[in-house]
Amino acid sequence: MIWIALSFLFFTVMVAVISAWKTRDDKLDTAEGYFLAGRGLPGIVIAGSLLLTNLSAEQLVGTNGQGWASNMSPIGWEVGALFTLFALALWFLPTYLKMGTTTIPQLMEARFGRGTKLMFSFVIVVMYSILNLPVILYSGAVVFENIFDISGIFGISKFTAVAILCVVIGIIGGCYAIFGGLKAVAVSDTINGIGLIIGGLMIPFLALALLGHETTGGGLVEGVKYLVQAEPEKLNAWASWDAAEPALPWPLIFTGMFFNNLYWWCTNQSFVQRALAAKSLKEGQKGAIYCGFLKTIGFFYLVLPGVIAYHLPSIQDKLAAAGSSAIDFAYPALVSAVVPKPVMGFFAAVLFGAILSSFNSVLNSASTMFTLDLYRTAINPKASDMQCVKVGKIYGTCAGAVAICVAPFVMFAQGITTFLNSMSQFVSLPILFTVLGALIFRKAPKYAPKVITAVHVIAYGAFMIIKPCYPTSGEPIHYLYAIAVLFVVEFAIMWYLNKYRGTEEYVPADVGAVDLTPWKYRHIVCIIGIILAIGIYILFSPIGIAA
């Protein structure tokens, strides 16, 4: 127990010390220095920060749970991100950096006017502050509690354990985001990302070795053989078109999921802000493309362990006892069974770092958007950089404090995570098409985003209320089918407005913020990534190991 605590503290403190050292000479009293790390992030740091912004503890448990409950089809969330990260690198980022974009709403204002900027800024800041932050804290605390049994160790109730964890995570994460700015967040993300890859990849290898030992008396190789031969359909990444959640129907890989990923990876502020802080277009493209490769191998620690847990004999009693909640306990049970005690402290620190990264990334983005898109636009247009940094710190402190107070009580709001995911879809495509107005639909009138938003909210709201079902199975239709249909409809509307109601063509201004020379190897590396993704889907298919 002492060794676990010491190794946990060592890694956690090491991350904090390195982050403080790397930001010791930064100018955090300017808006660009505080909110965009002085536009000085290299590609490797951008890649690590993008990865950790996306990867939450809830995702680690939830996606593995999906693999346990269905098959390998949830790898679509990981492998599919490769293509949208390439889109960010090749098409979105050059325009963002050319315009000197700090926040996505700033681009919206340049293209469609102040009203559009304020509308989306207000909605996004409210969602980040009221919904995302408390849920990130709560879900992270619950995952940590489920894996490491904090309540059992200290003899306290689960609610108390979750509340304490929320306070600890909130305070530490808030310190990174509020006092260190974006660079401190990005540096800590990079170190935690390295730890996560090491710790995360350790789990399937240990699990396969234990599977081989428990089933045949062998080791790792026997575990792999058993996994492939025992139930091959569990290794199939191609779910039927009418598969129920948590499986991912195969048509959505190319439609709804791709469009959803375009929003998250290419237009969502908490993700894109890391790339906007690049020291050059070359480094920004490297970061996005590197992250694409990291996401492609993500299924090794985000889906495969769940499939292994389905087969591992020693944890089946625990999962059976969990009943309907077994999907959320598959990964914690596997970790408890396979991670050696001397390594558990390191793994706990890695998981703690992933939770911190999710929280401080969203907190930093909420603070950035509130300050630059609401305060400086609507409240105090003449605010100096120093005033903006001060307001950003005050808002970040208040938002963090509210999240800490609210987070433990999310326990009593059933289905809050599903509700949060559903709410994000109400703004995903409208934001995406507003940004596309600066990239593709350059003649669309200024009222176009409002038309798209109205159509999307009404149509998606109707889908959520009616909850249509598949005619074949009677199961609810996957929400990404609705996103796929709405993307086509809204694209057609935007095309019509651009073609027949268009105004003078918009030309993005070049403000000379950074060097816009692209990475010369970007195309060949992207082609290699696409070949890798195709190879993975062939491997996990009926013509591969899922025969």
What are these regions (language model features)?
Residues 15, 51, 73-178, 256-264, ...:
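Helix-loop-helix module between adjacent transmembrane segments
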